[in-house]
Amino acid sequence: MEFEAVRISPGKYRGDALLVGLFQDGPEPALALAALDAAVAAVVLEVISEEEFKPKSRQKLTVRVGGDTGLRKVVLVGLGEQAKYKPESLRQCIGEGARTLKAIKATTAGVWVPPLGEGGEEATVEALVEAIRLALHEDRRFRSKKSDSEENGNSNNGGENKLTKVSLVVAGEGDYAAAVRRGNILAEGTIFARELVSAPANYVTSVTLAEQATAIAEANGLECEILEKEDCERLGMGAYLGVAQGTDLPPKFIHLTYKPAHSAPRKRIAIIGKGITFDSGGLSIKPAKGMELMKVDMGGAAAALGAAKVLGQLKPDIEVHFIVAATENMVSGHAIHPGDILTASNGKTIEVDNTDAEGRLTLADALVFSEKLGVDAIVDLATLTGACVVALGNDIAGLLTENEELARQIRAAGEASGEKFWQLPMEESYFEGMKSVVADMRNTGSREGGTITAALFLKQFVEKTPWVHLDIAGPVWTEKQKGYTNRGGTGFGVRTLVRFVLAQ
């Protein structure tokens, strides 16, 4: 799909369809649509009146125009109230509009919306490209029939996309090519993460995840180091390797590094993504119902690698390390037992109270490794606790840190990206419940406050570096199609990480 920004009057656009955004509390339709061709505007206004269309957020109306206007259809989409018009509200509304373009089988389309107040037309163009690319993404990798005609329309995202060219109507002068490029790159990184999360565990393993990381590095000029089991043993990564010993697949400790090519980095950041490619629970086995979704337990790794793919192309003057301790948590004669004691790479000992609290064990060694790199800040993302989903639901990630500046930066990047975070307290007294009689700590505490105790466990493996933990267990997957989000893996975290780094 090709995007272009065109400096023309919307009335001059010619193509299959024109997608037009209208405010709920904006000018009367006759005034708002005055820039359209007179014949087109007359037809559209008549249908608006007949249908009593009110442009509330994400409301849509399709009007057939035809004739000799050079335009087949006009698609109206409500943008809601002007005071709430921000990049994310625009993305959500245009995502719905893009689905309509797909449904009417448009091959060429124009898009005409009011510019955003912050960032102007360049920010508007970037948001439009993101929204349309993400809304129209469909994962057909595992279907025997790859086209909609072969499937007779049996699609999980409204049929096959015919759209090949999108013209974004702008009024002023700007670096719109750069904005289109940024929007495309952000969408591609998010789609990459979506597809990693959605793929089953017989396709995404520690081995294939390492192969994907290597490919990202080769394509984007990143350094790539894959530590094998023997390397991890030399580094004393007993917590990570304890989890990995239950699977027949080799552990792969992935370390990608992006470095600015032409200047010394202003900052150095480490991003850690939890990389459990399938979580059976180990000997503390999970119930069968819902276990098929445990393929998503590498959602943090997907976000980290998606961000690596994006930042490798945007090339900020920040050094970024992307770290994934990849393995799966399986049941076998080699798997760790409840009650086993593991020694992490910082020398601390852990009594394994529950083998299904394995992600924090792999993150422990990843955190120690990251801090030894001498970075200025560490961010970890993990589908870590069901407790976070109970507390915050499926749309909001948990944020835990003792560094308020890091919390502020993540929240700001999340708001700009349409990804929601809610800060939970690092209540130190809760760690009392994780103390062990036989080791330095247990890997679980009481049922209450499970997201907080998980973060307090991770804190034991960070000494001085500013660090923030993001529990993305809820928003990494969705069963709903809404705005620009489709059913399946969401790619949550990619765009927040990218904007967090770019804002340093």
Swiss-Prot record:
Protein residues bound to Mn(2+) 2: 274, 279, 297, 358
- InterPro entries associated with the record: Leucine_aapep/pepB, Macro_dom-like, Peptidase_M17_C, Peptidase_M17_leu_NH2_pept, Peptidase_M17_N
Is Manganese there in the keyword field?
yes
Q: What GO annotations for molecular function exist for this entry?
A: manganese ion binding; metalloaminopeptidase activity; peptidase activity
Keyword annotations for this protein? Answer: Aminopeptidase, Cytoplasm, Hydrolase, Manganese, Metal-binding, Protease
Pfam families named in the record: Peptidase_M17 (PF00883), Peptidase_M17_N (PF02789)
Q: Does the keyword Hydrolase apply?
A: yes
Kindly list the positions annotated as binding Mn(2+) 1: 279, 356, 358
Bilayer-crossing regions: none
Which co-factors does it depend on? Mn(2+)
Q: Please share the entry's free-text remark on the cofactor.
A: Binds 2 manganese ions per subunit.
The record's Gene Ontology cellular component field reads: cytoplasm
According to UniProt, the reaction catalysed is: Release of an N-terminal amino acid, Xaa-|-Yaa-, in which Xaa is preferably Leu, but may be other amino acids including Pro although not Arg or Lys, and Yaa may be Pro. Amino acid amides and methyl esters are also readily hydrolyzed, but rates on arylamides are exceedingly low; Release of an N-terminal amino acid, preferentially leucine, but not glutamic or aspartic acids
Q: Identify the SUPFAM superfamilies for this entry.
A: Macro domain-like, Zn-dependent exopeptidases
Give its localization. Answer: Cytoplasm
Q: What is its main location?
A: cytoplasm
EC number, as in UniProt: 3.4.11.1, 3.4.11.10
Give the positions the UniProt entry annotates as the active site: 286, 360
Gene Ontology BP terms? proteolysis
Family label: Belongs to the peptidase M17 family.
- Role description: Presumably involved in the processing and regular turnover of intracellular proteins. Catalyzes the removal of unsubstituted N-terminal amino acids from various peptides.
Q: Which NCBIfam families does the record cross-reference, listed alphabetically? A: PRK00913.1-2 (NF002073), PRK00913.1-4 (NF002074), PRK00913.2-3 (NF002076), PRK00913.3-5 (NF002083)
- The protein's name is Probable cytosol aminopeptidase
Organism encoding this protein:
Gloeobacter violaceus (strain ATCC 29082 / PCC 7421)
Instruction: Please spell out the taxonomic lineage of the organism that makes this protein.
Output: Bacteria, Bacillati, Cyanobacteriota, Cyanophyceae, Gloeobacterales
